[in-house]
Regions:
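N-terminal targeting signals for export/organelle localization
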Residues: 1-54, 182-190
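Hydrophobic alpha-helical membrane segments, chiefly transmembrane helices and signal peptide h-regions
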Residues: 9-21, 71, 109, 129-130, ...
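Short loop/turn microsegments at loop-to-beta-strand junctions
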Residues: 49, 71, 147-148
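Residue-level recognition of short loop/turn positions
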Residues: 57-59, 156
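Short active-site neighborhood of thiol/selenol oxidoreductases, capturing the structured segment around
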Residues: 61-84, 90
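Structural microenvironment flanking redox-active thiols in thiol-disulfide oxidoreductases
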Residues: 84-123, 132-139
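Thiol/disulfide oxidoreductase modules built on the thioredoxin-like
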Residues: 118-125, 131-190
């Protein structure tokens, strides 16, 4: 029974890493966590993560170019059954929220480019970064064994929500709409 204890231990470490990432500049604050969702209030969010890379279809992407937009980042792989199950819900949420200053980005991990492109074709209309080595996932404390995972960045690019499970539109859309409705922090306050 070592394996279940190892999994629980890894999940605890991953959650601690996410909570640490959501704390701000030495403040003694924590984020709210329930049912695999960690949500950080505006005053609890840390500096924006650096998310850059090559798109599956060619060209480059830098999430910093999206400041002013809420960015929903979904980590996925073509080999991941829950990723296949959530694709329609992600696309539905994207279509329902894109006119309110929301954009989506997929990050494909541990995959071949051909398999990733074939998986994405006809499923989602937003771009995906190709990250076969899972560098971006690991930089954001998303171990590949926790895929799928979805991260919602606020309009300043800070991590507002981390979801470590497959998402459904009825759960994700209200979260995205709530973050999109936030007022930007006054200059100099983070």
């Amino acid at each position: 029974m070592v394996a279940p204890r190892l999994v629980v231990g890894l999940l605890a470490v991953a959650l601690a890493a996410v909570l640490t990432g959501c704390t701000g500049g030495g403040r003694e604050s924590t984020c709210d966590s329930a049912n695999g969702i960690v949500e950080c209030g505006p005053e609890q969010r840390s500096d924006p993560p650096k998310i850059t890379g090559e798109l599956l279809t060619g060209g480059s992407y830098d999430v910093a170019d999206q400041r002013g937009q809420v960015v929903v980042v979904n980590f996925w792989g073509s080999w991941c059954a829950p990723c296949r199950a959530e694709a329609d819900d992600l696309e539905g949420t994207y279509q329902a929220t894109k006119d309110s200053g929301v954009t989506f980005l997929g990050i494909n991990v541990q995959d071949s480019r051909d398999k990733a492109i074939a998986f994405e074709e006809g499923r989602v209309s937003y771009p995906s970064i190709f990250d076969p080595g899972s560098r971006l996932a690991l930089d954001m404390d998303i171990p590949p064994n926790t895929i799928p995972a979805t991260v919602v960045l606020d309009r300043e690019g800070r991590i507002a929500v981390v979801i470590r499970a497959a998402v459904r539109q009825e759960g994700l859309q209200p979260i995205v709409e709530r973050i999109a409705a936030e007022s930007p922090a006054p200059s100099g306050q983070r």
